[in-house]
Structure formats: structure tokens, C-alpha cells
Amino acid sequence: MKNFKGRKFLTCVLVSLCTLNYSSISFAETQAGHANDITKNASSIDTGIGNLTYNNQEVLAVNGDKVESFVPKESINSNGKFVVVDVRKNHLQRHQSIFRLLDSVANRTYPGAVQLANKAFADNQPSLLVAKRKPLNISIDLPGMRKENTITVQNPTYGNVAGAVDDLVSTWNEKYSATHTLPARMQYTESMVYSKAQIASALNVNAKYLDNSLNIDFNAVANGEKKVMVAAYKQIFYTVSAELPNNPSDLFDNSVTFGELTRKGVSNSAPPVMVSNVAYGRTVYVKLETTSKSKDVQAAFKALLKNNSVETSGQYKDIFEESTFTAVVLGGDAKEHNKVVTKDFNEIRNIIKDNAELSFKNPAYPISYTSTFLKDNATAAVHNNTDYIETTTTEYSSAKMTLDHYGAYVAQFDVSWDGFTFDQNGKEILTHKTWEGSGKDKTAHYSTVIPLPPNSKNIKIVARECTGLAWEWWRTIIKMNKMFH
């Protein structure tokens, strides 16, 4: 009986040892398998993104408007004036790597966000590549913070990153703002408006936004009824940067595979990019609009933007009297975007100058961002090519010419000019006109007024005097050619 009990006890011990040994082996195999999966997933992401075939310039190329045919010139009579509409085809080519940030895309353009470099990205309406992420380091360039300028975001979603940025800014405001000042970083761009594609490329902003916020009448611009310039003032308070990965897989959780990324849109035509930095500050968009037909409108608007005293000089008084100015502000202490419409440009200047310093009451606003390709950390740049029509309208008024002969001799006058119009193809048509009194003798004192239509050009005046000399009976004393009205 004792031997039986001993054998039974030994058997139980052996079974227990076998069970423990089997469990240990199973756990070790599970751990090893998990490690292999992590390595395999990371390798699949790095290899998959590395093997994507695309050209950085071509994948983000934007071919805008194409202008095939147009009438180069036409003329109309309006309110006693002759109006010439001059139409020219221009081509604009720009490469932009800094994208203006709008409300509608703020939750897709935060530091560290992963996007798809496709047509939506080129249109500044990027799509997010949503997948589980690893922790991400972000840093801010506010002065004086040293090692406190960086924070780790455990789960870098839009909300978590925005909160981390707020923490960094709050730290600066509480500890360093009193002893450190921000350098002034104001960027300024301006352009005349000719078409949606042209102004979007020129100012690097979505045309729909400009259309909605500034109410640009593109049809009136195209018809020559209005002339519009838009200026963008961008003041950067600080920039937040996301740490660039050594490998694409450094951004994604160990459970993420390349297959998951491709299911969510990654392809040769939509390679992944990461928002590497976001600039925070404020932007002021200014629209200068006029119904003036003067050829000096662009010069007048440029002078107004750069010279505080140009209004008082009177040089462009007529243009400014027919103009209105609109300003839209993004950022600063306004809870909503301010919009001001005025005829007094000093109000616009005050808006630009006000709220120019970062503080608790005057927070920064995300205004622009830069993205980099995950494949090689190259900067993502959109390459815009677009044709656009530049329309210039010129008004001509009627005029009068006074002939006054008071010399003690017989005189003759020859006066002629060309009336010009344009046919349906924009080709100029000249009709030669001659004053009815041309070539007739006039004795002193003779005076008359010759009306000149508003579409007169190539005005010629010849005056002759009768000398009484047989060898030179008539002598030319005035000859004016190629005078343009």
C-alpha cells in the first residue's frame, strides 16, 4: 500500500512538471510569434512604402484651366465713352510646398497627421490616413523653453495633438513670455485677380475659400466690369514640428500592416505623407476692388498697400473714389473671423496692426503647414500649371481740338484721324476721317472747334501759310503726326 501511494505521488509530480514545462514552452512560443509579427508588420510597411513607384513632382501636379480660344479685343460704347476690352492669355506655373490652412481641414492638417498625396491634397483638401499610431514627439520653437519645448503625445490624434500644443504654449506664457519676445515674422503676398485657378495658385489658397469669404465676383472681373487685387498678410507666432521617422513604420502601431494601409488608400497614385510642421499665427486677407477702368489700377493698389500717404497725394484719387476694401481675419482674439468692408483703407491698416503679439487673450491660429513623403522624407510640393485670361478695360472720352489763326496771312489746315473699332475676331478696323474744312483758305482772325469722337487715334494736323513767293507759295509751319487720343 505504501509503495502504491508513493508511485501515485510520483506520477502526479511528473504530470505537474510536464504541464508546467508545456506551459512555459507555449508562452515562449507565443512571445516569439508576437515578436515575429511585429518585425513582419514593420518590414511590410517599410518595404511596401519603399516600393511605391511615383514621381514627387508628377503625383502632385495640377493642370488648371486651359484657354483654347478667345477674342483678343472688343469695343463698346457706354455713356458717351468708348470702352476697349483688351484680353490676353497668360500662363502661370508655381511650385508650392507651404499650404495655407483653412477651418475645413484643420482636423486633417495637425502636426504628425498622416495624409494621402492625391488630387484632394493638391486642392488643399487633404484626406487622412487613419491607422493606430505609436507615440510621437512634437516640438515648438518659442524662445527660451530649451528642453521644455518638446512633448510626447501617446496617441497622436487631432484632439490629443491640439491639447499638447496648448500645453506647450501655456508653459511658455506662464514661464517665459515675460522675459522673451517673439521675433516679428510677417509674410506678405499680393496679386491681381483674373481667374479662380490663377488667384488660388498665386496666393497658395483654396479659391473657394476666397470666393466665399471675400465675395470675389469672378464674372465681373472676366468681363472687365471690375478690377480686384487680393493681398495676404501672414504673421507667424510659432511653429510646431513633428519628429520625422527614420522609417515609415516608426509612425504606426505594431499591429498595423501595409495591407491595412493599402486598404485605406495608399497606392502609387496616393503615396503617404506626414504633416511635418504647422505654423501658428494669424492671416489677414485684403480685397481691393474698383469699377475704375483706369490702366493705373494695379499701380494704385500697390501704392495703397505700401504707402500710408498715397491717398492724400491725390495721384490716384479718382480710382480710390470708385473702390471698396474688404478684410477678413483668421486668428487673434476674435472668436469668429472678423470681416470688415470699408471705403477707408486706414481701417484695413489698423486691422493689420492690431493684435500683432501672442498672449493669453490673443492666441495663435493654425495658418499653414508643410508635409513630407514617408518614403524619403522629401517635402511634398504641388506643381500648378494654369492658363488664365487677363482682361484690361480702357475708357476713352471725346475731345475737342481748337484751331486759332490770327496771323496776317492766308492759312490752310489739314486735319484727319482714324476711328477704330474691332470685328468679331478682335481685329482692329480703322476708318479714316477728314475734317470738312481741310485744304481751304482761312484768313485772320479764324477760330473753330473740331469735335473728336472717343475712338479717335492717329490724329494728324498740318498747317500751311501762304508766303506770296513764287518759288514757295505754300510753306508748312506745323506738322503733327501719330498723335493718339
Curated annotation (Swiss-Prot):
UniProt KW keywords: Cytolysis, Hemolysis, Host cell membrane, Host membrane, Lipid-binding, Membrane, Secreted, Signal, Toxin, Transmembrane, Transmembrane beta strand, Virulence
Which terms in the Gene Ontology molecular function aspect does this entry carry? cholesterol binding; toxin activity
Q: List the disulfide bonds.
A: none
Q: How does it sit in the membrane?
A: Multi-pass membrane protein
Localization recorded for this chain is: Secreted; Host cell membrane
Please tell me which stretches of this chain the record labels as motif Conserved undecapeptide.
Answer: 465-475
Q: Which InterPro entries match?
A: Thiol_cytolys_C, Thiol_cytolys_C_sf, Thiol_cytolysin, Thiol_cytolysin_ab_sf, Thiol_cytolysin_sf
Q: Where is the signal peptide?
A: 1-28
Quote the cellular component terms of the Gene Ontology held in the record: extracellular region; host cell plasma membrane; membrane
Pfam families named among the record's database cross-references: Thiol_cytolys_C, Thiol_cytolysin
Instruction: From the UniProt record, give one GO term of the biological process aspect.
Output: killing of cells of another organism
Residue ranges spanning the membrane: these are 196-209, 216-225, 294-303, 311-323
Family in the record? Belongs to the cholesterol-dependent cytolysin family.
Role played: A cholesterol-dependent toxin with hemolytic activity against host red blood cells. Causes cytolysis by forming pores in cholesterol containing host membranes. binding to target membranes, the protein undergoes a major conformation change, leading to its insertion in the host membrane and formation of an oligomeric pore complex. Cholesterol is required for binding to host membranes, membrane insertion and pore formation; cholesterol binding is mediated by a Thr-Leu pair in the C-terminus. Can be reversibly inactivated by oxidation.
Give the multimer and partner information. Homooligomeric pore complex of 35 to 50 subunits; when inserted in the host membrane.
Q: What is this protein called?
A: Hemolysin
What organism does this protein naturally occur in? Answer: Bacillus cereus
